[in-house]
Swiss-Prot record:
Taxonomic placement: Bacteria, Bacillati, Cyanobacteriota, Cyanophyceae, Synechococcales
HAMAP family, per database record: Glu_tRNA_reductase
Record text on subunit structure and interactions: Homodimer.
Pathway membership, UniProt: Porphyrin-containing compound metabolism; protoporphyrin-IX biosynthesis; 5-aminolevulinate from L-glutamyl-tRNA(Glu): step 1/2; Porphyrin-containing compound metabolism; chlorophyll biosynthesis
Protein name: Glutamyl-tRNA reductase
GO biological process, alphabetically ordered: chlorophyll biosynthetic process; protoporphyrinogen IX biosynthetic process
Organism: Prochlorococcus marinus (strain MIT 9312)
InterPro entries per the UniProt record, alphabetical: 4pyrrol_synth_GluRdtase (IPR000343), 4pyrrol_synth_GluRdtase_dimer (IPR015896), 4pyrrol_synth_GluRdtase_N (IPR015895), GluRdtase_CS (IPR018214), GluRdtase_dimer_dom_sf (IPR036453), GluRdtase_N_sf (IPR036343), NAD(P)-bd_dom_sf (IPR036291), Shikm_DH/Glu-tRNA_Rdtase (IPR006151)
UniProt keyword annotations, A-Z: Chlorophyll biosynthesis, NADP, Oxidoreductase, Porphyrin biosynthesis
Enzyme class: oxidoreductase
């Protein structure tokens, strides 16, 4: 069996490719079933975020398993394999384990150390378990990866003051507005007419950071206006005017800065819509939705500047130098956790031999106990029988304790295999004809 991961991320694919591979929560169950339908795939889990799609699997054969996963990704995205493959990465065994732990720790994020990825890995684990697509191996790996993410954040300063996608989006707005004014600094957003489209978690974070950067008033547009109103209640210090999606156009026309973060799988704003507004003022769009909420053709409008998640790199790179130093410490913790998992996984090789040995000894125990009890006669009470039974079980457990502990202990694969062969030979656990 082999652990593999196949996927793509902000490091390997631009947003126009990533958005075609975004798997929304409501499609996870169907996707997991499709992956489990491949005979090579034993366990599988999907991590889908705005910056990555990664499929982790336990497969019988690594090459066939990886090919099956790539086939699924190509079919799902509608991108022919030849165009898709250059954007895909594959990690196997130890490298796959290390990658997931680094992802969970925020070490592979666009925004180094960001915290949201940890909750996304938790969700991946939960969805895999709910759909019964994961088993003992991936469940153990996912659980330990989540623990690793928590450990990195509690034992290092990587998560301290870490920026998120939302905060980077707000900083990008500050930077671009400042550059228009001749500054290379982050300016206040106090004078901007701000519109936020969407009322989910990312929009909540956007409003939090907008408030911190000088915004005291904004318009919040959402398809479900009740959800927008509920979000606005949590920000009593900001004047938030809530509107339905049917009022989006008129509110774009009176705004200078628009943030979009909705779950729409198709753009909700395109050039045709903007041209109908007859804009005569400069307008900036910052779209952190994946799939994108704003069509790429909007950039062709003379008064519009549009940015997406890939443009956040300009802001992120300004903050990364300090975090890179802390990341070294975090990487050493991740490596420790990787070794712990691999030692546990390697020890599973001994389980069939241990189970066979225990089963054979249990059979002997029962046979010999039955012989002894049959000689004790009717005067031997039920209580005494229970005592003798417990005694024989205790003896077997004591005999097994040391060899089982040794077989499961950390050691090289060669050492463990040699020990297993000795045990199999000494206790006749294998058919000699099959071994010859």
């Amino acid at each position: 069996m082999h652990i593999v991961v196949v996927g793509l991320s902000h490091r390997t694919a631009p947003v126009e490719v990533r958005e075609k591979l975004s798997i929304p929560d409501q499609s996870i169950t169907k996707s997991l079933k499709a992956l489990k339908a491949f005979s090579e795939v034993l366990e599988v889990s999907i991590l889908s975020t705005c910056n990555r799609l990664e499929i982790y699997a336990l497969v019988k054969d690594k090459n066939t398993g990886i090919s099956s996963i790539k086939e699924f990704i190509s079919d799902y995205s509608g991108i022919i394999f030849e165009d898709l493959n250059p954007h895909l990465f594959c990690f196997r065994q130890e490298d796959a384990v290390l990658h997931l732990m680094k992802v969970s720790a925020g070490l592979d994020s666009l925004v180094l150390g960001e915290g949201q990825i940890l909750s996304q890995v938790k969700k991946m684990m939960r969805l895999g378990q709910e759909n019964q697509s994961t088993g003992p191996i991936l469940n153990r790996l996912l659980t330990q990866s989540v623990s690793t993410g928590k450990k990195v954040r509690s034992e290092t300063n990587l998560g301290t003051g870490a920026v998120s996608i939302s905060s980077a989006a707000v900083e990008l707005a500050q930077l671009k507005i400042g550059q228009e004014k001749g500054f290379d600094t982050l300016v206040s957003l106090e004078s901007e007419k701000v519109l936020v489209v969407g009322a989910g978690r990312m929009s909540r974070l956007l409003i939090t950071h907008l408030k911190a950067k000088g915004c005291h008033k904004l318009i919040l547009v959402n398809r479900n206006i009740d959800r927008a109103l509920n979000l606005a209640i949590d920000f009593p210090d900001i004047e938030i005017v809530c509107k339905g999606l049917n009022e989006l156009d008129e509110n774009i026309s009176i705004s200078s800065l628009v943030f979009t973060s909705t779950a729409s799988e198709e753009p909700i704003i395109d050039l045709a819509k903007i041209e109908k507004l007859n804009l005569n003022n400069k307008l900036k769009f910052i779209d952190i939705g994946v799939p994108r909420n704003i069509s790429n053709d909007v950039k062709n409008h003379q008064f519009v500047k549009s940015f997406d998640v890939d443009d956040l790199q300009e802001v992120v790179s300004r903050n990364q130098e300090f975090r890179q130093k802390i990341a070294k410490e975090a990487e050493s913790l991740v490596e420790e956790e990787r070794i712990i998992f691999l030692e546990w996984w390697a020890s599973l090789e001994a389980v069939p031999v241990i189970n066979k040995l225990r089963s054979d000894l249990e059979l002997i125990r029962k046979e010999e106990l039955q012989k002894a009890l049959s000689r004790m006669g009717p005067d031997f009470s039920a209580r005494e029988r229970k005592v003798v039974e417990a005694l024989t079980k205790g003896i077997i457990n004591k005999i097994l304790h040391t060899p089982v502990t040794k077989l499961r202990s950390p050691q090289s694969r060669e050492e463990r295999q040699a020990s297993l062969k000795i045990v199999e030979k000494l206790f006749s656990l294998v058919d000699e004809d099959k071994n010859s």
